[in-house]
Amino acid sequence: MTPYVAVIQFPGSNCEYETARVLSHFGCNPKIIRWNEPDLLQDASGYVLPGGFSFQDRVRSGVMASHLPIMSQLSAGIKSGKPSIGICNGCQILAESGLLSESNHDQIDLGMAKNMSGHTSIGFVCDWVYVRPVHPEKSPLLRYFTPNDVLPIATSHAEGRFVLNHVLEARLSDTPHWMYCDERGQSGDFPITPNGGAVAGITAYSGRVLGIMPHPERAIFDWQLPWHFKHRTWTASWEKLIVAFRELL
C-alpha cells in the first residue's frame, strides 16, 4: 500500500479539501479519513487535523471531537512517532485530547480559551497576522525556519488563546513554538495578538507534533496573500513546514 497522510474529517470540518490540496502539491499523499473510520489511521504515515467547527463548537471548541473513538488510534500513532499537525479546530482537538501537553483526558494541562482584549471578550476574529518561530532548530517540523523569520498567516477563530498550567508555562521558553508578532518580529497586544495570548502554536512529542491556531494552508502561495503583502519579500514560506512534514513520513 502506498503511504498516505490521513487528513481527518470531523463532523463540522470545513478545511479538509484545501488542506489536502496543499499537501498533495508538495508531494504528500493525502487521504481524507472520516471520524468513523479509525482503522484507516493505522496505515497512515502521518496525520493532519484540519480547521473547521467540529460539532458546531458545542460545549467547548474541540472537546466533543476529542472523545471520539478515532482519537485512541490517533494518540497511539502520535506516541509511536508519526508526525502530526493540528490546524485551528484541529489544534483545539489535540489540546482537548492532551496531545499538545503529552497528558491525557484526566489531566488537561493546556487549554484553548476565548479570544480576549484585556478583560473584554472579542468573539470571532478573522484577519491576517504575523508569527515567528521560537527554537525552530529543536523541532523536526520547524527545522527549516530560523528565529528571525516572520511570516504572514490567516487567523480565523473564537477560542484560540493558549492557556498553560504552571508546569508547561515554565517549559515554554525551551519548547519550539510560534509567537504572534508584528511585521518586524516584535510582540504586542491586540490586534497583533488576535486572541489576547502571545502563543500562536506549540509543539509536543519531541517537536513531531504541532498544534497551530492560524491557518498555514491559507498562506502557502503568493496568490493567497492580501494585496498589501504581495509586494514584500519574506524570509520564509509555509512551504518549509509542509516539506519538513513530508520528510518525516
Regions found by a protein language model. Name each.
Residues D43, A76-K79, L110-L249:
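Amide-donor transfer/coupling interface in amidating biosynthetic enzymes
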Residues M1-I87, C91-E102, K114-V125, G196, ...:
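N-terminal beta1-alpha1 cap of cysteine-dependent amidohydrolase-like domains
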